[in-house]
């Protein structure tokens, strides 16, 4: 028998459907309550306002994105993928989780805008976490493979530049749609960024000849 979904999760799932369908401004507590199969008073027992409900839904989405990006990075590492491919997989999984939650909504730009206004604290907290996860991946891969960053480049700076690449790609795709085009362009930027951040690989020294030389005759054997 399938376990019943906890009320908190059921409400947030319903709220995301409502926000995706109507946008933030045209959504209401009543709509979210109806979608969750609750009365308005019952929903208020969990969340005091539409703004609090939206903020909680966004925060849960961010947490799922962290889990997705961490799993994607480790999976890519296990295949011996290049550092650039690992980071592209990691950041792509994070963004893919966010895209999937809002897929099909005609209110994408509004939702992206409102989440910055209504969920400012979670946005700042998770932005730092996202960047920290990328930094941990870079450090872990470089340590395991004995890779070195270019002189003057730190793990933290590379991770920060990776996040800036996301914002840079947004300038061409403000709503990050179509998602495939956005992610492809972001991948190009990340590859170029990472290539420039790595120190040149040092070639191993050439092996010396092992042939013996006979001193007395000069003959080589």
Predicted regions mapped to residue ranges:
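Alpha-helical DNA-contacting segments of helix-turn-helix folds
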Residues: 55-61, 65
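Amphipathic C-terminal alpha-helical segment
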Residues: 93-100, 131, 135-136, 140, ...
């Amino acid at each position: 028998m399938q376990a019943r979904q906890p009320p908190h999760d059921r409400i947030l799932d319903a709220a995301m459907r409502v926000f995706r369908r109507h946008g933030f401004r045209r959504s209401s507590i009543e709509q979210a309550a109806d979608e969750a199969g609750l009365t308005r008073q019952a929903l208020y027992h969990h969340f005091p306002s539409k703004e609090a409900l939206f903020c909680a839904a966004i925060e849960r989405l961010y947490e799922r994105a962290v889990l997705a990006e961490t799993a994607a990075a480790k999976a890519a590492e296990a295949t011996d993928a290049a550092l650039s491919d690992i980071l592209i997989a990691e950041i792509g999984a994070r963004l893919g989780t966010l895209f999937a939650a809002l897929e099909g909504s005609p209110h994408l730009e509004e939702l992206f805008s409102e989440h910055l206004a209504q969920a400012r604290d979670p946005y700042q907290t998770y932005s730092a976490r996202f960047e920290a996860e990328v930094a941990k991946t870079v450090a872990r891969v470089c340590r395991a493979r004995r890779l070195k960053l270019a002189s003057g480049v730190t793990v933290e700076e590379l991770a920060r530049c990776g996040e800036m690449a996301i914002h840079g790609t947004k300038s061409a795709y403000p709503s990050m749609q179509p998602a495939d085009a956005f992610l492809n362009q972001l991948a190009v930027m990340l590859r170029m960024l990472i290539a420039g951040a790595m120190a040149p690989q040092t070639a191993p020294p050439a092996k010396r000849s092992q042939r013996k030389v006979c001193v007395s005759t000069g003959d080589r054997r």
